[in-house]
Amino acid sequence: IPKNAEGKLPAIAVSGPFGAVKEQCSGLYAQTMAERGFITIAFDPSFTGESTGEPRRTASPDINTEDFLAAVDYLSMRDDVDAGRIAIIGICGWGGIALNAAAQDPRIKATAAITMYDMSRVSGNGYFDADDSEESRYSARKAWAEARSADLKNGTFTMAGGVVDPLPENAPRFVKDYYAYYKTPRGYHKRSGNSNDGWRTTGCQAYANTRFLYYINEIRSAVLIVHGEKAHSRYFGESAFRYMMDGKAEGYDFARKPNPVPVNKQLLIIPGASHCDLYDGGGKGMIPWDNIEEFLKKNLKR
């Protein structure tokens, strides 16, 4: 809550990255935006962190979307929140989830998707769509089915592992960036799956068999997608933005109508920034706080 707050204020719900906890990036975003005049909440998604749900470290497109909607429910019922001025911020995989939530709930008046992933696309197609084939998906489905059967037989859940540790010398640049955040004092947290043993082996299976951004071309409320120029994930944000605006884009196997309200949509590329630079600024002040604040205040006006 902002210091010296009076009356009903605009509010923001924040979550992400995918596999992180609120004490990491989302807490930073929530704190910073509170300092800029918003009531904010950063939350752990269901099955992770300090939130409840079994089995632990399980992800679900519908439940994760509902997590955002539940946060909006909570904010809308607070006496100090103007229920007509609620926004959401999603980071990394939660950027895509935020777009899905915005497509579903008109109470969300503005959405910022920061360094976003489309988790349904990467889970089903692999990075850079390298595994976008029936054969690759069938192989993955067989492996998941075998893992589920083994877990049931053994009565325990195997874990997929968080960020690789030790870090191979030949690891891709973005994996090294993940390591530099999640596995060092810069961003490590004991409850973070990414910092420790990751998701349950079959925990993200549901994302691989769905395409949950189908209706984002119908989002009427304001949307800001922010990506780093050098981010490996940049293609997720650019494709989602094009599809949201035009109803068609590379990586989306469906074509729909253009957005009915295109004037309040924005794609912002940060020069020189990597994916993880937008987690905490990367020590170089890469997060465009002023742009995010301006976007939210403009679109949360009464």
Kindly label every feature range from the protein language model.
Residues 273-286:
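Catalytic histidine-centered segment of alpha/beta-hydrolase-like enzymes
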Residues 58-79, 290:
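Alpha/beta-hydrolase active-site loop
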Residues 7-17:
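Short beta-strand element of the alpha/beta-hydrolase
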Residues 32-52:
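Conserved alpha/beta-hydrolase
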Residues 219, 225-227:
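Short beta-strand/loop motif that positions the catalytic acidic residue
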Residues 19-31, 45, 237:
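The serine-hydrolase catalytic nucleophile loop
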Residues 99-184:
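Alpha/beta-hydrolase-fold enzymes
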Residues 79-92:
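Alpha/beta-hydrolase fold nucleophile elbow
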